[in-house]
Amino acid sequence: EMLDGEEFKSIEFIGIDYSASAIEYAKKDFLADKNVEFICHDINELEDLNLGKFDLIISIGTLQSSNINFNAVFMSIYQNHLESGGAMILGFPNCRWIDSEMVYGAKAPNYSFSELSLVLKDIHFCKKYLQQKKYRVVVTGKDYLFLTARKIV
């Protein structure tokens, strides 16, 4: 269900990306919206921003960068930025383009074919961690694998 204009204006949205060009591109779509903020920053150092906590955290394709300590950053986001009872949506890339053809899975070192164990390891870690914190966790998707977690009440 889509939010109406007043509902949208009552919610604070913050987007964070390491890429300055991605931030500038995103800002163009939300120029008139005072409740939407975009920040160019390294997510390894989120604590520098003093963001506080949020009811919903969405991270799509950002935690799988090679310069990120996945487990530590994920746990920090959960512990420091998700409200008690909040929800998370995490998107894990499950495909890449090679010569105009979509290939599923990731290219792993020393393999001549796509391999899923790295992304499945990350998804399993998040799922197990959140289930231990009493979240209902569902994994869906195809091109991206989405982990959706809601607190069990």
Which residue stretches match the model-derived regions?
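Class I SAM-dependent methyltransferase SAM/SAH-binding core
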Residues: 1-46
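A structural alpha-helix within SAM-dependent methyltransferase catalytic domains
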Residues: 4, 78-79
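A short acidic, Gly/Pro-enriched loop at the edge of an enzyme's catalytic core
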Residues: 44, 48-57
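A short SAM/SAH-binding and catalytic strip from SAM-dependent methyltransferases
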Residues: 54-69
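A short, conserved alpha-helix within the catalytic core of class I
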Residues: 65-78, 92
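Conserved beta-strand signature within the Rossmann-like core of class I S-adenosyl-L-methionine
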Residues: 84-95
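Conserved Class I S-adenosyl-L-methionine
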Residues: 101-129
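Core SAM-dependent methyltransferase catalytic element
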Residues: 128-153
